[in-house]
Structure formats: C-alpha cells, structure tokens
Amino acid sequence: MKLLIVCIVKHIEKNGKYYGYAPYVREMNLWGNYVDEIIVVAPIKEVDIIDEIDSAYNHAHIRFTQVPNFNILSVWETFKAFFKIPVIFVQCLFAMAKADHIHLRCPGNISLVACVAQIFFPNKKKSTKYAGNWDPNSNQPWTYRLQQTILRNTFLTRNMQVLVYGEWPNETRNIQPFISATYYEDEKIEFQPKDYTQPLSFVFAGALVIGKRPFLTIQIIESLFQKGISVRLHMYGDGPLMPELQDYVKRNGLETVVFLYGNQDKSVVKASLMDAHFNILPSKSEGWPKAVAEGMFFGCIPIATPVSCVGWMLGDGTRGILIEPELETAVSQIVTALNNADLDAMAKAALEWSQQYTFDRLEEDIRGVLFVRD
C-alpha cells in the first residue's frame, strides 16, 4: 500500500532522512508500520538544523514532494499565494493519483488545497486527521471553517474518515472521534491517593506563547500563594515569552514558588506529572490538549479552560477543574474545588479515563482506518 500524507509540517532533509515535529512524526511512524511506501507532500525548511523537538521518519521507503508554504496575512503574501496555490494543487493531484490511501493533516493552508484536490478522487480510500478545534461553536479562521465544511460534506468528500478530537452532536456519518496518545499500555500505573493538605504541586507543560496563557497560569499560582495556600508551579516548555516570565517571577519575588525549566526530556516531564497534584493549562484554544491528557494518565488533576474538547475530556468537571480565563474567577473556582471537591475521586476518574487511550490502542485504531471495510 502507498500512503500519501499531505501536511503543513515543515520538514528538514539531512543525510538522506526527513525530520519533522516529533509528536507528528511519532504518530506517522505508526501509520507507516502498515504500508509499503510513504509519499509526503509538505514544505521543507531552508536550514538543516535539527532541533530537540524534531524526529525522523523510520520508514525505509519515503518519497518527498516539496511544496511552497503560503499565507494570506498581508496583501503581498496574498499576491504570492495566487502563484503558489496552483503549484500545490497540481502536486497534490499527482501525488493522490499515485496513492492507495490519501491522508490529510488538517487544518492548514496546504491541507485546504488538498481538501479541494481530494474531491477529484471519490473512489480512493481517504482519511483526515483534524488536529485542530472541531467545536462548531468556536471562533475560528474562515479557512478552518471552509476545511470543516468540505470535510463534512459527504457529496464532495467521499470514502473519507474524518478523525476529530472529542464527540460532537449532529455530525455527518464520516466524522469520527479519534484520540491521540503519548504513553504505552505498560506505562500505566495504579491509582495512588495523594495528600492534598499542602504543599500543592502544579505542572504547566506547553509552549510559552500567548495562546497557552502562561502569564495567567503564574498569576493564578501567585494569587493562591497570597491567600496563604502553599503552592509550587513547575513550568516545562520554551517560547518567546520566556524572558518576560522570568522577569515577572523575579520582580514579584516568586523564585521559591514558580520554577521555569525550559524544554525538558519527555521522561523529566513524566516524572514531574507523576509527583504533582494538578496539571494546569488555561489555553485560549486547543486541538488535542496533549498536556492535559498526559497529566490525567498519572492521576494528576487537570485544571483547564473549557475550549475544544476539554469539557468532554474532563467530564464537565467530574474529572478535573474547569476554569474561566479571568484571574479572580479562575482562582475562586480552584479554591472552591480545593475546599469542597472529592479530589481523590476526581484524580482517579481522570486516570481511568486517560488510561483508556494508550499508544497501543492508537496503533490499532490507525490500522482500522487504513484497512476499513467497505
């Protein structure tokens, strides 16, 4: 079987291997276990510097078709896009003609072009992993909405399984819940009650960017500390906000409360989650909130905003604490939970839910997508 992957992930070619964003490549290597050849249509980075977050495909037979990246964020970029889009469209058509199974990674500008191209192959087996927020009531770019509209339309999009995060009402028959995973079956642990009589350990794992709201996270912990609650916040991840966050911690005398570690190995984050009481992520938007699911896997109670499928993951508050993205309200909601909720029951429910979705199960689910029966 020849598997075609169309995605926006910028790749690096070095020493005959192709590298990309590690969580994406790690999953695509699972798809590769069941196919004879992989065809990738994606952009290539101009530099060949491999970052810690990059990983290589492990399949022996990979063909790569480079396409230009584009955006429509300015008049000049929109003008250039008019010349790039036809090139991408034709490249997608050629690659799709060669493939036995067409797999799109949405949302993204290149995948939008691919969404249109796949219409011309109604009889080929197809799948789409929609790695963004599928919530029909959320505020999203019109290009994302257009991709969702095309994918939902069973006349335009035939023979396609659309894999989305969470369960959503009133969807077309080709929209299917599909849960990503980080840990294997043999990494499961038994639930162990924790002592919530302080000090309380919180973990933030994510990019230090505006969308993840790391400033709000620190301010929540600061406010809890000022209320006399013994708390510690361990932050894993890097990004453009790191200098400002470090300065805020120093200026406000939080050096013994907030600890910024930057990017760390997966094993370091895992150990911290196993030891922590809470996992906090007050994001503006999420596709699959990976960090939340990872904490839940070890009985770490999630504290998160109800974006995307988070409310579904947290059982509308039975498996975690849902907060609003406003400081005083969020702090009040957390304090209420600390005083009134059965935290052990909440942590146990979080662990049991997340441990349903292992990497082993993900591999079986992928096999089911590739070899779906008519």
Locate predicted features.
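Short alpha-helical donor nucleotide-sugar binding micro-motif in glycosyltransferases
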Residues: M96, N263-Q264, A271-A276
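A conserved mid-protein helix/loop that constitutes part of the nucleotide-sugar donor-binding site
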Residues: A207-S223, I229, P240-Q246
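Nucleotide-activated donor-binding/catalytic signature segment of Leloir-type glycosyltransferases, i.e.
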Residues: Q246-Q264
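A short, well-ordered alpha-helix in the C-terminal region of glycosyltransferases
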Residues: L254-V257, D342-Y357, G368
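Short alpha-helical segment that forms part of, or immediately flanks, the ligand-binding pocket
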Residues: K270, P289-F297, G311-W312
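Aromatic "clamp/platform" in nucleotide-sugar-dependent glycosyltransferases that forms part
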Residues: K284
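Short hydrophobic beta-strand element within catalytic cores of glycosyltransferases
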Residues: I301-A304
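Conserved acidic donor-binding segment of nucleotide-sugar-dependent glycosyltransferases
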Residues: D316-L327, T336-A341
